Amino acid sequence: VKEVYLDEDLISEIRDMRPKLIGIDAPLTLPRGRRGVEDKEGPKFRLCDLELRERGIKFFPVTLGPMRSLTLRGIMLKEKLEKLNYRVVEVYPGATQDILGIPRKSRGLSLLREGLRRLGVRGVREGLSGDELDAITAAITVQLYLEGKAEFIGDPTEGLILIPKG
């Protein structure tokens, strides 16, 4: 795990790794019919969001204050990576943690670290931030997909989220 802040640095790291699939922990699409993140009148949820809710998984909608900038950055990063011929998917570590039965970072970083270790993840050391632990969880989601143990929820024409099969 390595923290990077600028898109250019992230893309450089990705080029070095040459992944088969990239999971981004941010909304990568807007609800169908929504004109932008600042649109006050458009739909608030995507089908994939509603499917999370049906499964009892809590999330922040793309229209919520701080999620707006995260959504914009996610969409722009996805576009940059796809132009470089990478396959990019949306992941939600909170959903993966809930489905796999490990605590979210809101319950405490030590509990999340221990949960990741129980899953067999090596290198989960003290001092990793909540964002880094979520990045590890995102990578687990992608690995599960590559092993046939994860699925997409939502509508392909609106947006999909990759989650472990329950």
Map each language-model feature to its residues.
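Phosphate- and other anionic-substrate recognition elements at nucleic-acid/protein interfaces
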Residues: V1-G166
